[in-house]
């Protein structure tokens, strides 16, 4: 499981380092939503962290862009990423914005 270098963290998340450790161990957590990037569809998606319990995600771990305390907060984080993308690049291509440093 990989985490984005500038991980987006929602305001309701009290201890992101502890949550990261627990996610790496596939611990069952309540009220933790993940903003993920999957290479296959080149989109950001919101999942409850319990989705990681499925075998598919153990073989194909997602790239985690952000952690939120609710689905609504995760959507707000995606909106914030979109606003940053438009202000810095003039485009709403979130994936290109998030990974532009890695391509340079």
Predicted regions, residues:
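A short, charged, amphipathic alpha-helix used as a generic interaction element across diverse proteins
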Residues: 60-64, 69-84
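Short aromatic-glycine-(Arg/Gly/Cys) micro-motifs in beta-strand/loop hairpins
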Residues: 28-62
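A general structural signal for short secondary-structure boundary/capping elements
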Residues: 25, 37, 80-85, 100
């Amino acid at each position: 499981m990989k985490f984005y270098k500038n991980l987006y963290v929602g305001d309701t998340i009290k201890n992101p380092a502890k949550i990261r450790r627990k996610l790496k161990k596939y611990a069952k957590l309540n009220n933790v939503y993940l903003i993920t990037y999957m290479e296959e569809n080149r989109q950001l998606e919101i999942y409850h962290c319990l989705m990681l319990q499925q075998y598919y995600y153990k073989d194909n771990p997602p790239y985690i862009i952000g952690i939120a305390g609710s689905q609504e907060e995760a959507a707000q984080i995606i909106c914030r990423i979109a606003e940053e993308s438009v202000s810095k690049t003039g485009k709403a291509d979130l994936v290109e914005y998030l990974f532009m440093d890695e391509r340079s």
